[in-house]
Amino acid sequence: MTATDPVANLQTLIRCPSVTPAEGGALSALEAMLAPLGFTVDRVKASEEGTPDIENLYARLGTDGPHLMFAGHTDVVPVGDEAAWTHPPFAAEISKGELFGRGAVDMKGGIACFVAAVARHIEKSGQPKGSISFLITGDEEGPAINGTIKLLQWAAERGERWDACLVGEPTNPDRLGDMIKIGRRGSLSGKITVHGVQGHAAYPHLADNPVRGMLQMTHALMDPPFDGGTDDFQPSNLEVTTVDVGNPATNVIPAKASASFNIRFNDSWTVETLRAEILRRLDAAAGNGELRPGRDPVKYDIVWADRPSHVFLTRNNALIASLSSAVESVSGQSPKLSTTGGTSDARFIKDYCPVVEFGLVGQTMHMVDERVAVADLETLTAIYETFIARWFANAGL
């Protein structure tokens, strides 16, 4: 086996059961691919109290600039019901032109293809006039505390600097070449608790039902819309994700009700202005007596989740142009530049260098029978190889 073969690379990685937080041999397998290509490889273990230790990998080829980083993750989500899979989730079997396995799309496939692209570039043209690095974590699908964010800090403290980054997440909705992600919405979560007075359901005048107050509060969070979208981002959207009263009895008015929410927000907002708007809405709803006639304002408190994600947009023309032209020349498609979807580790990388995302088709990610077309692996490798050549050619412009 040589690292120039993306299919063999991916099969090797899939056969490593690296469900977060387990390394599962995946980083060791990647190290074995990169070291023969001339990469200096560091394994970095990160820890934080209350969270599992995580193994990460940083590898660099070259010592000079310009410096291109490829970022991704080898950890995968659980397989779910293994009996429902038509092929074992860690066997990496090929059937009817598709390679099956957990992580095939998200995102061991992207890593396998970029390794192959670098190997082919070296084989044909020698080492790039600059540096290429791999920044790979085992903690993207989990809490993302001991992963990319700490690996970036570790590398930066050692003097590492990057000019651009490509993240190999599965960005394409339907066909390879559909979409490049050039930014991401922000993400903010919180938990509201409404306090009432417990009592008998037959004697509501002696109690204060917090569910009524919670209905007011959650409605105020979702209506009216926060905005209508911007030139680069879709409208901000808030979803209530859990509601709980902790009360199994049908004849008891509960003492409190809680609800969690998450909002994905665009560049109309910052975390600070969004928190202020949410509090404004909650305070206004608390004093609305429509659902609680004759009652005092709703008593509530709110706890904000740690580590909100900030909105960002990449405007680096050389990076975007190099990738867009590579996608179009290989796939024949002109990719859409998009900021849709959820968050990724690009949210951490954007603080260090311009970052874009492009990988496989994401239709089966996290699903039973996650799989990728073998032909797509070859196409993505060709796109990455073309991108590498064009980025280094344009990086000094």
UniProtKB/Swiss-Prot annotation:
Q: What is catalysed by this protein?
A: N-succinyl-(2S,6S)-2,6-diaminopimelate + H2O = (2S,6S)-2,6-diaminopimelate + succinate
Instruction: Set out the biological process GO terms recorded for this chain's protein.
Output: diaminopimelate biosynthetic process; L-arginine biosynthetic process; lysine biosynthetic process via diaminopimelate
Which residues participate in Zn(2+) 1 binding?
A: H73, D106, E169
Instruction: Give the active-site positions.
Output: D75, E140 (proton acceptor)
> Where does the record locate the signal sequence feature?
none
User: What is the disulfide pattern of this chain?
Assistant: none
> Which InterPro entries does the entry mention?
ArgE/DapE_CS, Bact_exopeptidase_dim_dom, DapE_proteobac, Peptidase_M20, Peptidase_M20_dimer, Peptidase_M20A
Keyword tRNA-binding listed:
no
Q: What is its EC number?
A: 3.5.1.18
Pathway field: Amino-acid biosynthesis; L-lysine biosynthesis via DAP pathway; LL-2,6-diaminopimelate from (S)-tetrahydrodipicolinate (succinylase route): step 3/3
Keyword annotations for this protein, in alphabetical order, are: Amino-acid biosynthesis, Cobalt, Diaminopimelate biosynthesis, Hydrolase, Lysine biosynthesis, Metal-binding, Zinc
General function of this protein:
Catalyzes the hydrolysis of N-succinyl-L,L-diaminopimelic acid (SDAP), forming succinate and LL-2,6-diaminopimelate (DAP), an intermediate involved in the bacterial biosynthesis of lysine and meso-diaminopimelic acid, an essential component of bacterial cell walls.
HAMAP family the record matches: DapE
Complex formation: Homodimer.
Q: What is this protein called?
A: Succinyl-diaminopimelate desuccinylase
Q: Which organism is it from?
A: Rhizobium johnstonii (strain DSM 114642 / LMG 32736 / 3841)
